[in-house]
Amino acid sequence: MGGEERSGDGEKRGEEVVDAGSLFVLKSKGTWWHCGFHLTTSIVAPALLSLPYAFKFLGWAAGISCLVGGAAVTFYSYTLLSLTLEHHASLGNRYLRFRDMAHHILSPKWGRYYVGPIQMAVCYGVVIANALLGGQCLKAMYLVVQPNGEMKLFEFVIIFGCLLLVLAQFPSFHSLRYINSLSLLLCLLYSASAAAASIYIGKEPNAPEKDYTIVGDPETRVFGIFNAMAIIATTYGNGIIPEIQATISAPVKGKMMKGLCMCYLVVIMTFFTVAITGYWAFGKKANGLIFTNFLNAETNHYFVPTWFIFLVNLFTVLQLSAVAVVYLQPINDILESVISDPTKKEFSIRNVIPRLVVRSLFVVMATIVAAMLPFFGDVNSLLGAFGFIPLDFVLPVVFFNFTFKPSKKSFIFWINTVIAVVFSCLGVIAMVAAVRQIIIDANTYKLFADV
């Protein structure tokens, strides 16, 4: 492979890595365009629709500062992670997974007991959260058509799970390239729609009063600030950069940077427009999902045409399915390594049947959890605090310092150290804030609740 040896968890036979996960799921066949599609799908997701909600705890100045800071730090961190991967590839060891990097750069225990488990928890948490949000969007579409309909949320979660069940059978990360190119278009469509609707509603004579004051007692406001910062950090989160870079064909040098530039162009076009227009229109009344603000709570009628509500929810549902299947790939990689025989063909009966059964089982389990726990968003905040923040803000700079060993007197050493320390502290505080929110909301939790 262009002089680069693909390093996975499996045994090696000469030049061949006997690891079904790397052979079947993490195929290195993509271009930088494909990489850009994968990156955009994993980062520019419907979680961005909660950015106006984060702003209401921060206000204009702090909100925009955090949004700019999140973009700058994650772009920097992802660039360092990519450069670290390219460096090891140039030395003959191409690491395909986050846990492989931790294993070889830090120690085997870091890969096995820390990075691997938290990455899997984050990925599966994203799948569950997307199934729940997909069900909520499907229900919103249903209520547009049948305002007095009696179907419950868990039924729509199951419908979304059926869609995900089909998409989960795509054999490899690379095989998702066309789905993820469509995903890029969808995120532009629902972001532009959300921004346009916010501007339209904000200019209406009967628009909600624009109030940007930050409410609550000092304790609530402090926790609100850290909660909002965690929301923004998680929205920029990825957690699977090495797996995405693994899909690029050799030589990899420079391709990831092009993909990142493409992705962050979309980030700027979507994150900032939705956050600023949504907060401008609704202020402190901004909800966790900006679409819910399009309903006039006093009249129970939408500020915008119902066909518009149907369309933006459709765009969101379709992209949610793409995001979920992207985050299934690291899980599929592990499953494939366990259940498949790398000495057999990828589509042999020996490999296809176990793949179909096990992938379907994991999707069904995620769908059941999403249907049972419609309050999973609180739990997902906790997962984001201890998962996305270390994976995307802390470990990349640590890997870079351990790999390149910059002088302790150099600027890059200290900026990396400061980033690692600051975001480690933010992660701990965000976990405390998430646990506090779970305790506050515990009395409202109900299995299979129709929210």
Curated annotation (Swiss-Prot):
The chain crosses the membrane at residues 35-55, 57-77, 115-135, 153-173, 182-202, 222-242, 262-282, 308-328, 356-376, 382-402, 411-431. It is found in: Cell membrane. InterPro entries: AA_transpt_TM. The keyword Transport applies. Keywords: Amino-acid transport, Cell membrane, Membrane, Transmembrane, Transmembrane helix, Transport. GO terms for cellular component: plasma membrane. Induction: By wounding and senescence. It is a multi-pass membrane protein. GO terms for molecular function: gamma-aminobutyric acid transmembrane transporter activity. It comes from the Eukaryota. Highly expressed in flowers and at lower levels in roots, leaves and stems. One of its GO terms (biological process) is gamma-aminobutyric acid transport. The keyword Transport applies. Disulfide bonds: none annotated. Optimum pH is 4.5-5.5. High affinity gamma-aminobutyric acid (GABA) transporter probably involved in GABA uptake into cells. When expressed in a heterologous system (Xenopus oocytes), imports GABA, butylamine, beta- and L-Alanine, 5-aminovaleric acid, 6-aminocaproic acid and 8-aminocaprylic acid, but does not mediate the transport of proline or glycine betaine. Belongs to the amino acid/polyamine transporter 2 family. Amino acid/auxin permease (AAAP) (TC 2.A.18.2) subfamily. This is GABA transporter 1. It comes from Arabidopsis thaliana (Mouse-ear cress).
